[in-house]
C-alpha cells in the first residue's frame, strides 16, 4: 500500500519517543489489566461526569527539529544587550567543563531529591561543598543546601528571626532602605500574612525603633555602597534583635564575613558563581546561620553521618524539620530547593579555587575602580565613596545618557533618582569599560585604561580597610585540587557515578512524576538568547521571552480549564502559597477577610498545611474513609462548622491515595455552597492532561508542577516551577512585581519570587514538550501513565496488596503497595524493601507517604514495558526473599533485605552471611550493575552528631 506524505513526514515522531511502551507493548499490557483499549481503560477509571469530550486544543504535534527551529526564531527576538543593571543579577562565564559535564548531563539533571542517600552520594558531596563555600564566605556555623532565590531567602530569614527571637511580644521587622527592591517586595508579601509590621529606613535608624524582633541589612547596598555594620550589629544584638545580612558571594571573596561582624543570619544569591541570569532564574540562594539556630533553619541541610559499616557517608540531616513531617508546624513550606544550580555554583568554586576566585573578584573590583576614576576625571560625581562592583553615578541629563546607552546596546540601571547604576561582572573587559566611559561622559574618545589602572592600583580606597577580608577561604583540599580540566572532568564523573538517575533506571517515586526530560527539550536553556537576559531589562529586549511565555501560558490555560495563569512561583510549594494568597485577597476584596479556615484532607501532602499556615490560615483536617476518599459527611460537617469563616479546601486530584474520587465535583459544590474556594493541588496533573482539567472539575485555582507533568527535570532536588492557574475572579489577586509590570495581568499584589516570571529560563523545556506532543500526544501520555500504573498494580497485587483502588479495582497513575502485613508477619519493613531495590538497580518508590508502612509507585508514561517488567520482577523476587525469611531459611537479623544495600568492598571481605555473595550483589544478573558506594545510613547518628561541612579527603578514599 502506498504511504501518504503525511505518514512519511511523521510529525508525531516525538510522541513515540516520549511514550515508553510501543503499540505492541501497550496491547500486551492492556490484556494483562483486562481492558480492550486505552480509551476503554480510561472510561473504567475516570468518572464519566468529569471526562472531556475532546482534549484541549494546543495544536498538532511537531517534530523535535521543527519545534527547535520555531523556538529558535522566537528566541531570536530577544536583544542581547550588555547588562550592567545589577540588582543581584550579573553576567557570568559558566566554565565549559561544568556546562558540558553537568548542566547538559542527564546523570546530573534527571536525579531526584536525595531522600535515598545510598544512591545519592555524588550530589550530596557537591551540595556539602556548596555548604562549605557558604560557611567560609559568610563566617557562620551552619548552612543550608540552597533556597529558591535571594528574595525568598530574605523572607525565610524574617520568619526564622521571629521563630528564634526571645522578644516574644515584638512584632516589627526593620529593613534597610538600600536592600534590593525585589527583596523588599517579597518580604512585605510574607510579612502581611504573618501580621508583621515592616519598617523601611536608613540602616542606622533601626536603633530608633522599639519592639523589633529582627533587622535586615545588605552588606553591599543595592546602589553599590559597601557598609561596615559591625557597630550597628553589636548594638542591635545587645537589644536581643536578630540581625540578618544580605550578601553577595563574589563580593564576600574580598569583603569581611558578616558572621565575623556578628550577623545571626546571612543569605544571598549564588547566581554569579557560574549560573546565567536567564531572565530571572533559576538561581540558588545561600543561607547560613549561627549554630544555636540550626533547628530553626529553613530548607535542606546536608550532614555527615556513618553507614552500617561505620564508614563516612552523607545524608540530608534533620529532616523532621521539613513540611513532610511537621506539616503546618514546619519551619517553612519549602519542598524544592535549587540543587542543580547550587551544584553548578559549588563546582565553580571547586574549579577556580580560592586563588582563582580572588583573581576574578579582584578583577571586577579593579575595573570598577578604573571606571570610577575615569568618570571622576571628567567631573562626574559618584554618590558613594565605597563600592565593590557597582557605581552610582550622578548625571544631570539622565535621559540623554540612557539614550546613548541604548544606542550602544548597553543597559544601565535607570530607576535611581538623579543617577544611573553600573554593575560590573566577571565578563567585563577593557573594551567594555571604554564603552561605558564614552556612554556616560558623552565623549567620543579613547580613555587610557593602563594609566587609570596605575592610578587606582596603589591607592584604592573604595573598600575600607576594615572591610577587607583577612582570613583564608576554601582551604579544604577539594577546592585546591581540581583546577585542570582533566582533573575537573574526572572529579565530576566520579561524583556522577555514585548516583542513580534516569539515565540508568526508572525512578518509580509516587507523587513525583519522574518522566523523560528529552534532550530536545533541554537544548534551548543554554542558548545565549535565553541565558543572557537580565530579568529587569526593557520589555522590548525580551520580546522572544514574552512571546514564549505568552504561548506557554495560553496552552496551560487551555489544559487546566482556567482563565489566567501566573508564572512567578518558582516551586510547587510557592505556587500553593501564591494560590492561597489569591484566595485570601479575593475574600478581603469582598469584605470577608474573616474567612481564614482551610480544610485539608488527612491524606494531603505536607506542603499543603505548611502553605496554608504561611498564608495566615487555620488548618482543619477532613477525614478520609476506608477507601481513602474524602469523607463527605465529615466534609459537610467541617464546612458547616466553619460557616462564614470557611476560606477554602486544598484537595489533590487524583487523590494522594492514587484514585480518582467519584465525588470530586460534590466536594467542590459543598465548599462553594459555604462560600469557600477550591484549591486543587496540581501534583497529580499527569493523570489529568487531555482527559479532564481542574477548571472543568470545578476548582478555582491550582498550581502546576512543571518539573513533574511538563518535563522540567528534577535536577537532583531543584529547580522547580509552580505557576498557578486561576478562574477569572481570582486573576486580579495573583502575584505582581514592584520592578517589572507584568503585561496583561491586572494585579496590584506583592511578589512571591524575586523575578517577575520566576525561573524563566527553564520555561522553554515545557514549551518544547507541549509543542512536540500536541493535543493528542498529551492525552496519550496521560492515558499511558495510567496504563503503566495499572499494569504494575495488576502484576504485583497478589504479592503486595494494593491499598486503595477505585471502580473495578483500578488505580490512577500511581498505586500504593501495603507492606504492613508483611512487616507484621516477618519483621521486614518498607525500608528494607527500598534498600534491597538498590541491589536490583532501582531507586525506591516513595516510602510511608501518604500512609505509613507503604510504598507508592508512579511509573509515568515514559517507561517501556521492558523496564516495568524489570521493576516488577525485582519486586516479585524480593517478595520471594521475604518468604524465605518468613519460612526461617534466613534469620530475621541476617538476610539480604536487612543488610541491603550491598557494596563492592564487602564482597572482597570475609563472608559470613547466611546467603551468597552473588545473591547479595547480583540478584538481577551481572549486566549494567549499579553499585552504591555506601551501605545503609545511620540516621540517628547523623542527627545526634550534626556535622555539615566538608570532611577530610581521606574519608572519601
Curated annotation (Swiss-Prot):
Its cofactor is pyridoxal 5'-phosphate. The modification N6-(pyridoxal phosphate)lysine is found at residue 708. Gene3D superfamilies: Aspartate Aminotransferase, domain 1, Type I PLP-dependent aspartate aminotransferase-like (Major domain). One of its GO terms (cellular component) is cytosol. Pfam families: GcvP2_C, GDC-P. The keyword Metal-binding does not apply. GO terms for molecular function: glycine binding; glycine dehydrogenase (decarboxylating) activity; pyridoxal phosphate binding. Coiled coil: none annotated. GO terms for biological process: glycine decarboxylation via glycine cleavage system. The keyword Oxidoreductase applies. Keywords: Oxidoreductase, Pyridoxal phosphate. It catalyses: N(6)-[(R)-lipoyl]-L-lysyl-[glycine-cleavage complex H protein] + glycine + H(+) = N(6)-[(R)-S(8)-aminomethyldihydrolipoyl]-L-lysyl-[glycine-cleavage complex H protein] + CO2. Its EC number is 1.4.4.2. The glycine cleavage system catalyzes the degradation of glycine. The P protein binds the alpha-amino group of glycine through its pyridoxal phosphate cofactor; CO(2) is released and the remaining methylamine moiety is then transferred to the lipoamide cofactor of the H protein. Belongs to the GcvP family. The glycine cleavage system is composed of four proteins: P, T, L and H. NCBIfam families: gcvP, PRK04366.1. PANTHER family: GLYCINE DEHYDROGENASE (DECARBOXYLATING), GLYCINE DEHYDROGENASE, DECARBOXYLATING. This is Glycine dehydrogenase (decarboxylating).
